[in-house]
Amino acid sequence: MTVQTSPPSAALAETMLDMGRRARAASRELGLLTAQDRTRGLKAIAAAIRAAAPDVLRANAEDMAAARAKGLAPAMLDRLALDEKRLEGVAAGVETVAALPDPLGRELARWTPPNGLDIARIAVPLGVIGIIYESRPNVTVDAGVLCLRSGNAAILRGGSESAKSSAALANAMRGALKSEELPVDAIQLVATTNREAVGHMLGGLEGALDVIVPRGGRSLVERVQAEARVPVIGHLEGLCHTYVHAAADPKKAVDIVLNAKMRRTGVCGSTETLLIDVAVAATLLPQIAKALTDAGCELRGDGRTRAILGDITPATEADWATEYLDAILSIAVVDGLPGALAHLARWSSGHTDAIITEDTAAAETFIANVDSAIVLHNASTQFADGGEFGFGAEIGIATGRIHARGPVGAEQLTTYKYAVRGTGQVRP
């Protein structure tokens, strides 16, 4: 598979429709496979990625050179970059997905109503999933293998910045499927960087797509949600918060905040706003600020924060709404737990928020009242990751309320049907 630039519109439309038809056919073939067949395919993919490492890393080096020439931000470059360690992590993640319990055929519930029917709710695939994402080549693999594990066919459309890396990875995955005599079109990558391809996917490819999963910045996700004619599992943005409560353990507070912000600043689980209780701000905030600035983090604060820390950049309303994906942190001093909850009610994206406290009652109040997909107590927001949840990988973090919420793994890429068994009943 090679990267194309801009085929004529009519040709692109037919190419996309053909991909949809082939994906639909592959999804039917997947329905005939056993769990062991899919596991065999996943293990073959892990081996193929390792074998293709020189080609993948060479392609990634070309993508990185082009991205630097275009002046991509450091956070975007970090997301795009692959090295031997990261690529081995990708392959190991595939093996973890292969070892997961099969999500299909699970009996979710079973009951017998007064009419005597035996009714079971059974997990089944969604069908054909379109995944639209930006400059993260690992998503090519994560999305492809999670769809395979859950019996879904995948049409992948990555960002132009990662086009060569994604093509090399897709070639490895498809080659593995072919070698195992499994449906190769279960994983397809849109080979063109022409943005019209996204529009075709949003139209549903004449009924071929059952759901679309966007993974990227706000503009991408908002476009998908506004224009898609098929259901969307949306991942809007991170904009995560960490609240240091009055009863926080000081060492935990310093360690967790430093990790939540600086472990990897370019991931969606990075804390972008620190809320600190007024009761401990004067004593604890300077310790946290020193750890952050020593690590190279720029701080921005409200008036009470600046009164404690001195000469730092004033935080504006725009800062409270900004996912920096960089070594920048906004800080607000809040009036206890009610003040933290009020700030989150206004500014949280619904992705991931955390409280640091030794007060169990306060933690439970926070968990119950913060309306986010992931709410943590005494842990870094950087645990907002499907791999850390034991899902092996994730296709994204869903911030909506319909179908899936939080890390979207193989289990979340299923729906259900009802198997109803009778003994000759007719309805009166």
From Swiss-Prot:
First-level EC class: oxidoreductase
Domain of life: Bacteria
Recorded GO MF terms: glutamate-5-semialdehyde dehydrogenase activity; NADP binding
Biological process, per Gene Ontology: L-proline biosynthetic process
GO annotations of cellular component type: cytoplasm
Enzyme Commission no: 1.2.1.41
Residue pairs linked by disulfide bridges in the UniProt entry: none
Family matches, as Pfam families: Aldedh
Entry's localization field: Cytoplasm
Biochemical pathway: Amino-acid biosynthesis; L-proline biosynthesis; L-glutamate 5-semialdehyde from L-glutamate: step 2/2
InterPro entries, sorted: Ald_DH/histidinol_DH, Ald_DH_C, Ald_DH_N, Aldehyde_DH_dom, Glu-5-SA_DH, GPR_dom
Role: Catalyzes the NADPH-dependent reduction of L-glutamate 5-phosphate into L-glutamate 5-semialdehyde and phosphate. The product spontaneously undergoes cyclization to form 1-pyrroline-5-carboxylate.
HAMAP family the UniProt entry points to: ProA
Name of the protein in question: Gamma-glutamyl phosphate reductase
Organism: Hyphomonas neptunium (strain ATCC 15444)
Highest classification ranks of the organism: Bacteria, Pseudomonadati, Pseudomonadota, Alphaproteobacteria, Hyphomonadales
Gene name tied to this protein: proA
